[in-house]
Design a protein with these regions (language model features):
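Short C-terminal tail/terminal secondary-structure segment
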Residues: 2-4, 130, 134-135, 212, ...
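Canonical Rossmann dinucleotide-binding motif of NAD(H)/NADP(H)-dependent dehydrogenases/reductases
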Residues: 5-37
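Amphipathic alpha-helical dimer-interface segment in Rossmann-like NAD(P)H-dependent oxidoreductases
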Residues: 62, 94-113, 119-126, 160-168, ...
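Conserved NAD(P)H cofactor-binding loop of Rossmann-fold oxidoreductase domains
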Residues: 77-82, 232
């Protein structure tokens, strides 16, 4: 198979939440295959995009299209973390409503291409609470808020909805990562790692490959799909 199929040279890729845990790795990965990457976030990026504000999304999208002419791939990466957040409304607003807002507004301006959503294994399965016993991160108890699980399950449903709505011109898919190592407490990392078939948490750069696949012509017949990237955690009981 020709490497050219995986080539995203001069494709315009919009990434939300680009300064978060995984965002910088996604930016790096897409730049490595020749894409024009537009990294956005609520601060510290050239183009500011707040996924909870439709006005912000419209303003940012118009700037991008004026500069580059089009958007080929949208990556809905912005999210409220599930480490210890407890605010139901804010988590839903960012993770679920934010994904909806961007998919609706930016998708309507895309002529063709790919939308890739980012969910979580907690959108598929319930938490194993034993992992979080006596686990603290930045001085706060770790856990999985109900809003986080509900929002990520909703993202999976939205993926199928927009895949149906935008077919056949725009493909819409979802990646479903498991735990990403981010200097969590050693006790948590050890317990979590024993739950996976690969015996470890994911590195920050190990989700980006699936995004490249879903943005490229290698996945030209893939839409409405969820790619689970969890080291086999959800594949066994």
């Amino acid at each position: 198979m020709s490497n050219q199929i995986f080539n995203l040279e001069n494709k315009v890729v919009l990434i939300t939440g680009a300064t978060g845990i995984q965002g910088p790795e996604h930016v790096k990965a897409f730049k490595s295959v020749g894409a024009i990457v537009v990294a956005t976030d609520i601060k510290d990026t050239e183009i500011i995009l707040d996924v909870t504000s439709k006005d912000s999304i419209q303003t940012a999208t118009k700037k991008i299209i004026e500069k580059y002419g089009q958007i080929d791939t949208l990556i809905n990466n912005a999210g409220a973390t599930g480490k210890y957040a407890t605010d139901w409304e804010q988590i839903i607003k960012v993770n679920l409503t934010g994904t909806y807002n961007c998919s609706e507004i930016i998708g309507a301006m895309m002529k063709q291409g790919s939308i890739i959503n980012v969910s979580s294994i907690y959108g598929l399965v319930g938490p194993d609470w034993s992992l979080y016993e006596n686990a603290n991160y930045d001085g706060k108890p770790m856990g999985v808020p109900a809003g986080y699980a509900a929002s990520k399950g909703g993202v999976i449903a939205l993926t199928k909805y927009f895949a149906s709505l935008y077919a056949p011109k725009i493909r819409v898919n979802c990646v479903v990562p498991g735990g990403i190592f981010d200097n969590q407490p050693e006790s948590f990392v050890k317990k979590y790692s024993t739950k996976t078939m690969l015996g470890r948490m994911a590195n920050k750069n190990e989700v980006s490959g699936a995004l490249l696949y879903l943005a490229s012509d290698l996945s030209s017949y893939v839409t409405g799909a969820n790619i689970v990237i969890d080291g086999g955690l959800t594949a066994r009981v």
